[in-house]
A protein has these predicted regions:
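OB-fold and OB-like single-stranded nucleic-acid-recognition modules
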Residues: 1-104
Length: 104
């Protein structure tokens, strides 16, 4: 059984990218460490409540985050979020210098 860590009000399974790809954690809260593989795409969403959405690839897994984290290609990050099978809907991104968190 993998280790669980707490962030905010939720617990996250600390797993590797290989464990995610095997498919055992679909729909679960996970924490994964990896390297940002491509330029993060930060989109402005001009709605009634304007917001930002960042999308990037981390070791072969797509990550979506509701915000604009200050990360770049090659950064080592830990992503906290729900694994949906093909991507992680991140609720927090931890870098060496900062922690970026969305509202819960």
């Amino acid at each position: 059984m993998p280790r669980r860590i707490k962030l905010g009000h939720h617990y996250y399974y600390l797993v590797s990218v290989d464990e995610l790809i095997s498919g055992g954690y679909r729909g679960k809260n996970v924490a994964v460490e990896g390297t940002v593989g491509d330029k993060p795409l930060v989109e402005f969403l001009p709605m009634e409540l304007p917001s930002y959405r960042a999308t990037f690839n981390m070791d072969g897994i797509r990550v979506e985050f509701a915000g604009s984290p200050c990360i770049k290609v090659g950064d080592r990050v830990r992503v906290y979020g729900r694994f949906l099978g093909d991507c992680i809907m991140a609720s927090a991104i931890e870098t060496e210098g900062a922690m970026f968190v969305t509202e819960e």
